[in-house]
Amino acid sequence: MKKEHVSHCQFSAWYPLFRSLTIKSVILPLPQNVKDYLLDDGTLVVSGREDPPTCSQSDSGNEAEETQWSDDESTATLTAPEFPEFNTQVQEAINSLGGSVFPKLNWSAPRDAYWIAMNSSLKCKTLSDIFLLFKSSDFITHDFTQPFIHCTDDSPDPCIEYELVLRKWCELIPGAEFRCFVKENKLIGISQRDYTQYYDHISKQKEEICRCIQDFFKEHLQYKFLDEDFVFDIYRDSRGKVWLIDFNPFGEVTDSLLFTWEELTSENNLRGEVTEGDAQEQDSPAFRCTNSEVTVQPSPYLSFGLPKDFVDLSTGEDAHKLIDFLKLKRNEQEDD
């Protein structure tokens, strides 16, 4: 994977070419002062939020108690920076897209920060909603600081013009999303995107799903993207129509889901792993999905919202911690 491959997967690089195949979006240049604010690792103070209501006369009885929590009357009040011009641009764009948007940077969306939002969703209606997600996201920080970390070439990093991408909010069903892997302009693999869950309809319709995705790829994407190796995400709606969601580089920076990158780069284990209906076709992609509830896994974003020890206990990944936890509970019961 080279740096130019990563650059070609920036939203603004591919959206003009495939606008008719995807969700309506608006791209706004990200001012330098906004970027600096998003990268500031100080206390999270979100711009654009209303001040909390002041205490009324009826609350005066709590004044003494509240005063005790103040270390120093001269303590500085944290204030959020304001970006009035940018805020106006963002709000106009949000309104033009129906009032709610899905935000992302050049490459990534703050999927790892959904837990911090009031609605536990990436649905945003204001700039402050976006700031809260962006400042809480490791994925966004990666876009800013290490976009070319897995690239093999030693050439200077391309100059990046950072952009805020606002996509019209659509209620997408996770079980209808798929990730597709293309090598040398050939579709070699398709994976269920939400691989942590079992969806009965995917197992029952996998031949039809695979055929729809192949037809979409051959008609709209094959030999038309900027590179011959790439990854693309699609959404198949209830009518069977396929929508393009995103492009990603063909390499370790992209989650391979139910495949491994060793399999995808060598293709050795993909031969013969075709759907039954396409068994005679040499170029049929391997199709993988979660086949039963037994193979359901924890969400990959779980670790971003909870302490690691909690995650290890809940998933059973650290046997020693689990044993210690059980011993602690037993001792507590004996003490009682």
UniProtKB/Swiss-Prot annotation:
Its GO biological process annotations read: eukaryotic translation initiation factor 2 complex assembly
Region annotation (Disordered) maps to 48-73
Q: List the disulfide bonds.
A: none
Residues with the modification Phosphoserine, per the entry, are: S60
Keywords from the UniProt entry: ATP-binding, Chaperone, Cytoplasm, Magnesium, Metal-binding, Nucleotide-binding, Phosphoprotein
Binding positions for Mg(2+) per the UniProt entry: D246, N248
Q: Does the keyword Magnesium apply?
A: yes
The PTM entry states:
Phosphorylated.
Q: Which residues of this UniProt protein bind ATP? A: K104, W107, A109, R111, R167, K168, W169, C170, E177, R179, R193, D233, D246, N248
* GO MF term set: ATP binding; magnesium ion binding; protein folding chaperone
Q: Which Pfam families match?
A: D123
The subcellular localization recorded is:
Cytoplasm
Q: Which domain of life is it from?
A: Eukaryota
Which stretches are tagged as biased composition: Acidic residues? 62-73
Q: Which InterPro entries match?
A: CDC123
How is this protein annotated for GO cellular component?
cytoplasm
Under the heading PANTHER family, the entry gives: CELL DIVISION CYCLE PROTEIN 123 HOMOLOG (PTHR15323:SF6), D123 PROTEIN (PTHR15323)
What this chain does, per the record?
ATP-dependent protein-folding chaperone for the eIF2 complex. Binds to the gamma subunit of the eIF2 complex which allows the subunit to assemble with the alpha and beta subunits.
On assembly, the entry states: Interacts with the eIF2 complex gamma subunit EIF2S3 (via C-terminus); the interaction is direct. Interacts with the eIF2 complex alpha subunit EIF2S1. Interacts with the eIF2 complex beta subunit EIF2S2.
Instruction: Return the similarity comment.
Output: Belongs to the CDC123 family.
Protein name (database record) = Translation initiation factor eIF2 assembly protein
Q: Which organism is it from?
A: Mus musculus (Mouse)
